[in-house]
């Protein structure tokens, strides 16, 4: 009974180093891209195969190679230790922007699954996280005012808030002036507004 050898991208995803090496020895580039621009390096990073990543880089892999969405392997990273190696050992560029104008830290933050990883990536940039859950209460108040005053996101060219959200923030701020504690309400609406903004700009990640 014959078996089919998995292609290099599946082998890299599964961490099958021996199969990946056979593909490399047969002449396939570590930078070979599938129809979506996805490379073996993207796969190794996404699934956390550090030993395989090392081999791919040693065989000429480009750590900052982009897929069709303009995303480098750093964008699909899910583990702190892999991110550490990408940046400190392989010199991955944390400032690369994808086709939507977002850096890896912003994309990972927007996905919401790996907040510590996003925070780590932000530490290598001049940008600040937009997660309002990490903001002090007074800062949430000022952030709410800023979002109602700033009509457009300059990078995306889209409204930061719709009219309904602006009206709700105005209502909450008015309640605060009467002495009512509105921190939880502000947190919820700001989180929702930011999530909606990112959903318009970030493609869903898939395994």
From Swiss-Prot:
This is Ankyrin repeat-containing protein P1E11.10. ANK repeats lie at residues 36-65, 69-98. The keyword Cytoplasm applies. Its main location: cytoplasm. Keywords: ANK repeat, Cytoplasm, Nucleus, Repeat. GO terms for cellular component: cytosol; nucleus. It comes from Schizosaccharomyces pombe (strain 972 / ATCC 24843). It is found in: Cytoplasm; Nucleus. The keyword Cytoplasm applies.
């Amino acid at each position: 009974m014959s078996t089919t050898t998995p292609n290099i991208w599946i082998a890299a995803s599964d961490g099958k180093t021996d199969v990946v090496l056979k593909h490399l020895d047969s002449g396939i580039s570590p930078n070979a891209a599938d129809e979506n621009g996805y490379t073996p390096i993207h796969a190794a990073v996404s699934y956390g195969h550090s030993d395989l990543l090392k081999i791919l880089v040693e065989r000429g892999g480009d750590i900052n190679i982009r897929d069709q969405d303009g995303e480098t392997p750093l964008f699909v990273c899910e583990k702190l230790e892999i991110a550490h190696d990408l940046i400190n050992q392989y010199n991955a560029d944390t400032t690369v922007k994808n086709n939507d104008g977002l850096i890896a830290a912003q994309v990972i933050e927007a996905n919401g699954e790996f907040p510590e990883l996003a925070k780590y990536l932000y530490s290598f940039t001049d940008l600040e996280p937009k997660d309002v859950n990490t903001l002090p209460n007074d800062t949430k108040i000022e952030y709410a005012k800023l979002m109602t005053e700033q009509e457009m996101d300059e990078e995306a060219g889209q409204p930061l808030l719709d009219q309904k959200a602006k009206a709700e923030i105005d209502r909450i701020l008015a309640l605060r002036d009467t002495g009512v504690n509105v921190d939880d309400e502000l947190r919820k609406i700001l989180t929702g507004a930011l999530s909606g903004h990112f959903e318009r700009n970030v493609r869903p990640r898939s395994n």
